[in-house]
Amino acid sequence: PVSKKRVKHWCLRISKYSDRLLEDLNKIDWPEPLKEMQRNWIGKSKGVSLTFEVENSKNKIEVFTTRPDTIFGVSFLTVAPEYSDLHEICNADNRVSIENYIKKVSIKSERDRLADVKIMSGVFSGSYAIHPFSGKKIPIWISDYVLGSYGTGAVMGVPAGDQRDFEFAKKFNLEIPNIFDKINITESAFSDKTGFKLINSEFLDGYDFN
């Protein structure tokens, strides 16, 4: 049987060569999900870290985003199956379904998980996070499209502006709040993210989305 194990390994100073690596990555004829995995591994990103408190808990979930201006479009958080504090943030009533899901996806490699972008899977943690600005309850989900080895192992779901988040929200009947003025997101997310104004975003309403 095949199993995953933690082993010691060398870490190269990739960030020193990030510009060259990212530039040359565009010349490689690889599937886009694998390229995206490499971009994440190279690690050059400009953005901010946001912290969501877990409801009725001392735990917090930190996410990194390159688009903090979409914060009011967040309708769920997704953590990786191998998220470090997973058992602490999950509701005990959902433990069986969570453990079954983790067992199911544990046999897949990271490459397989990124390659299967059209196959959405996940399980509800039974817990909620608190939106840092609106105070709204945000459901916390577990899905194998998030990798524990990249970033914080958690991402904020903005279905209005990300197609992957849009498809995930559609499959699991999650809210899809529209934050883009005069943009129809009934069939797909607005992935261009340029040239329009923000709506339904409290103090960000009216700002240009560039």
Model-inferred region functions:
Residues Y83-S188, I199:
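Catalytic alpha/beta core of large soluble enzyme barrels
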Residues P1-S3, T66-P68, I142-G148, S188-S191:
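Short, flexible, solvent-exposed loop/turn segments with mixed acidic/basic and small polar residues
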Residues L25-I28, T78, A92-D93, V105:
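Alpha-helix boundary/capping residues
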Residues K60-Y83:
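Conserved phosphate/anionic-ligand binding catalytic regions in large, soluble enzymes, centered on
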Residues P1-I61, S84, A154-N210:
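Residue patterns forming the tRNA-binding/recognition surfaces of aminoacyl-tRNA synthetases
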Residues I42-K46, E55, P68-T70, I119-F124, ...:
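A short catalytic or substrate-binding loop motif that flags glycine-/basic-rich loops and adjacent residues
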Residues R13, F64, E82, I142-S143:
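A secondary-structure boundary/capping signal
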